[in-house]
């Protein structure tokens, strides 16, 4: 039986890789990236619900079951997917291809009893029990392997996903773009350079073949007859030939370098250009290290297709030309060379799978190690404040040691292959020497002819030796092509062939109508949400963390599409507008402020690149950022460190607010935009918002309720639903969820025993009602 094993690309790909194995078993080829999207894989991985949903979408009939050890031996459809817990304590999926099966219920029970008796007997005798029941599994993180049922049950949770293809299941291969074609499209504009590289290679080949005749002329013509005058001429001619060869070789190398650079620019920038067009869910479900390692994949492909591919093509041409010449010179010696070549080619095929497996492991572990380093460095403040440097270093060391072990195994495989290749070349080289010299001694061949054959034969055998040496690089390129193609085939967030309306300004009401949404296959983040933001009005979203407030802002920014329902602006469906124009028309301040390694001036005007310094200063004053910027050494020309390190959280938020105010949009979305500010600065900013921006529409997400009490409408969210709506005063009168949140923030708590009457805790400060605005103020 052929087992269709697929290795996972990244740490969260195990479920997708397992489903890909099952699909391949039934003659359907589909990419891991496509399966990730279908099952809703995110940074936490994939749950069983998502995997079952994807399998059903592909045309499988599914059943998620829990089995004990006895029932696992019963007959059921394989391959299936099993949930296991890794040695590190992480949930993981593997594919079960084959196992010990006992169909009869009675025989199965007797089998279990016999095993239990043998187990006890071995324990009494101090022997190790050997389980004869087996399981063949495809572990996407490791390998295809056959293990005992005892070993399997050490990690097996008992959960299986059984799958059977229905009439709706379609075999075949998912249509994929060709990375080779993409690369050839990049090479075509550089066809002149490529032609020069090939031409120089052809000239070098001709010169090389001609040079091999030097020894023949020397041994057969000059030495036997003592032609001293001819000796000088021959040496002079071949010296000129060798110098010419060196110069052409140098020119060829420069052409290849220049060709590499010309291809490098569109390839690398093309990759990142495509990545920037991908939807937010692509980034939300992948670690940064996993994305950046694809950049290395692009570099590997470029290296193979420029220098290596050209060399291999020319080496093959050279082998064919010299093969014909060698055959005409001496068929016997040529047959030995052919045998050497065939053995070398066989060696390449023998080591193909080991190299493929080790390269896949290397690339996967490289992504894990990169992600670990990036996370550790990004969270260095958290690491240090918790004195967890040693623990983080241990985690990094653990992943690095895994990388070293994989590298060691790779080196062992390369060494073994190289040793076998050397032995083949050496032994058959000695055989060639013996046969050739015997022919010279028997007068069947001249000494010069033998030496010419020996020199020329290297042009025939060397290409194959080069191919053996390049096998690791070629395998890496093949895997890189597969990994990179899956990213390049990932659909952009908007169909580039469709015409969209460009939004200039948001003029009109914004309406959410029965909108539902979920991240991947998780529980719904929003359930049938409906509300309207009237033009020029201020609407607030409040509620506990995870209630769906930020999700609404992301849908409005078109980071994600609603699962159901519609969002409209001025009566026009938001889907009709291009993503870029919608985002340009909205001034958004996110929870997590991202600053770049640029000047403060450049960081603020990222929302309006053409803005002047005076306009940037005006926006900074609105955000109450001008004063702290003015105190910096170079003021607005001060260069920020990576991610704005060196600035406080409040200073970062003020710069983010300045960006938004500079945009001067008709709609502002403020998502916890003042959470790091002191009360004085926060009040100053909201005073400006409610007065200077009174005619602008606003969606304000806030936990600090005092900032949104003057909003025209407050929406209270809980578990993805709007549970209350109204003004501040109306919601307080209802004494519902909003009243609870407000009371908690004022230091007032409900007495659960006495009902809803609010009481102050013993340690609470005295609460005084301000007669002017009715806000509870704690002194």
Predicted ranges, named:
Residues 194-248, 255, 327-332, 443-447:
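Transmembrane helix-loop-helix hairpins at lipid-water interfaces of multipass membrane proteins
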Residues 273-290, 361-409, 481, 499-501, ...:
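Loop segments that connect adjacent transmembrane helices in multi-pass transporters
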Residues 198, 202-213, 243-250, 301-304, ...:
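Hydrophobic alpha-helical transmembrane bundles that constitute the permease/transmembrane domains
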Residues 215-216, 256, 274-321, 378, ...:
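Juxtamembrane loop-to-helix connectors within ABC transporter transmembrane domains
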């Amino acid at each position: 039986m052929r087992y269709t094993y697929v290795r996972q690309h990244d740490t969260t790909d195990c479920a997708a890789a397992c489903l890909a194995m099952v699909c391949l078993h039934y003659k359907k080829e589909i990419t891991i990236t496509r399966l990730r999207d279908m099952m809703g894989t995110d940074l936490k991985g994939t749950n069983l619900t998502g995997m079952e949903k994807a399998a059903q979408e592909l045309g499988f009939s599914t059943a998620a079951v829990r089995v004990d050890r006895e029932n696992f031996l019963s007959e059921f459809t394989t391959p299936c997917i099993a949930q296991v817990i890794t040695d590190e304590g992480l949930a993981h999926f593997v594919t079960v291809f084959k196992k010990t099966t006992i169909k009869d219920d009675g025989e199965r029970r007797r089998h279990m009893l016999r095993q239990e008796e043998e187990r006890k007997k071995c324990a009494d005798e101090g022997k190790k029990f050997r389980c004869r029941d087996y399981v063949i599994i495809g572990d996407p993180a490791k390998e295809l392997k056959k293990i005992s049922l005892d070993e399997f049950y050490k990690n097996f949770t008992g959960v299986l996903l059984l799958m059977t293809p229905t009439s709706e299941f379609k075999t075949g291969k998912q249509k994929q773009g060709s990375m080779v074609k993409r690369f050839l499209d990049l090479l075509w504009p550089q066809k002149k350079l490529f032609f020069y590289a090939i031409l120089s290679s052809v000239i070098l080949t001709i010169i090389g073949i001609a040079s091999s005749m030097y020894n023949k002329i020397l041994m057969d013509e000059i030495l036997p007859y003592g032609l001293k005058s001819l000796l000088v001429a021959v040496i002079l001619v071949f010296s000129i030939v060798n110098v010419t060869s060196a110069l052409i070789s140098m020119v060829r190398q420069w052409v290849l370098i220049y060709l590499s650079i010309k291809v490098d620019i569109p390839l690398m920038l093309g990759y990142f250009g495509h990545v920037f067009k991908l939807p937010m869910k692509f980034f939300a479900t992948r670690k940064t290290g996993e994305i950046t390692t694809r950049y290395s994949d692009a570099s590997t492909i470029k290296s193979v297709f420029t220098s290596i591919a050209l060399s291999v093509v020319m080496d093959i041409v050279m082998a064919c030309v010299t093969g014909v010449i060698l055959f005409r010179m001496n068929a016997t010696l040529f047959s030995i060379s052919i045998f050497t070549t065939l053995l070398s080619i066989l060696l390449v095929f023998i080591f193909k799978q080991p190299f493929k497996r080790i390269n896949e492991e290397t690339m996967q572990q490289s992504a894990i190690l990169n992600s670990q380093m990036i996370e550790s460095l990004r969270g260095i403040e958290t690491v240090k404040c918790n004195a967890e440097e040693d623990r983080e270093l241990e985690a990094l060391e653990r992943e690095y040691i895994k990388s070293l072990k994989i590298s060691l195994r790779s080196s062992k495989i390369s060494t073994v292959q190289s040793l076998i290749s050397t032995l083949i070349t050496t032994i058959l080289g000695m055989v060639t020497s013996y046969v050739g010299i015997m022919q010279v001694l028997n007068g069947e061949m001249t000494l010069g002819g033998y030496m010419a054959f020996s020199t020329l034969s290297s042009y025939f055998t060397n290409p194959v030796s080069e191919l053996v040496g390049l096998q690791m690089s070629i395998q890496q390129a093949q895997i890189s092509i597969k990994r990179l193609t899956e990213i390049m085939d990932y659909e952009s967030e908007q169909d580039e062939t469709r015409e969209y309306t460009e939004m200039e300004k948001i003029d009109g009401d914004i309406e959410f109508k029965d909108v539902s949404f979920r991240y991947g296959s998780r529980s719904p983040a929003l359930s049938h949400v409906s509300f309207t933001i009237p033009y020029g009005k201020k609407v607030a979203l409040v509620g506990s963390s995870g209630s769906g407030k930020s999700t609404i802002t992301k849908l409005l920014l078109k980071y994600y599409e609603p699962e159901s329902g519609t969002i409209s602006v001025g009566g026009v469906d938001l889907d009709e507008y291009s993503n870029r124009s919608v985002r340009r028309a909205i001034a958004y301040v996110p929870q997590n402020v991202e600053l770049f390694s640029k000047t403060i001036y450049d960081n603020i005007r990222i929302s309006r690149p053409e803005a002047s310094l005076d306009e940037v200063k005006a926006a900074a004053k609105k955000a109450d950022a001008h004063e702290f910027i003015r105190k910096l050494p170079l003021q607005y020309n001060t260069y920020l460190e990576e991610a704005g390190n060196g600035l406080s959280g409040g200073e970062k938020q003020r710069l983010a607010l300045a960006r938004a105010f500079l945009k001067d949009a008709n709609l502002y979305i403020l998502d916890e935009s003042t959470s790091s500010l002191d009360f004085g600065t926060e009040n100053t900013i909201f005073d400006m918002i409610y007065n200077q921006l009174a005619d602008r529409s606003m969606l304000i997400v806030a936990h600090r309720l005092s900032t949104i009490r003057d909003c025209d409408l407050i929406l209270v969210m809980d578990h993805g639903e709007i549970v209350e709506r109204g003004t501040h005063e109306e919601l307080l009168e209802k004494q519902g969820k909003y009243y609870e949140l407000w009371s908690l923030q004022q230091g007032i708590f409900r007495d659960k025993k006495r009902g809803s009457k609010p009481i102050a805790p013993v340690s609470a400060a005295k609460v005084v009602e301000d007669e002017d605005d009715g806000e509870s103020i704690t002194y």
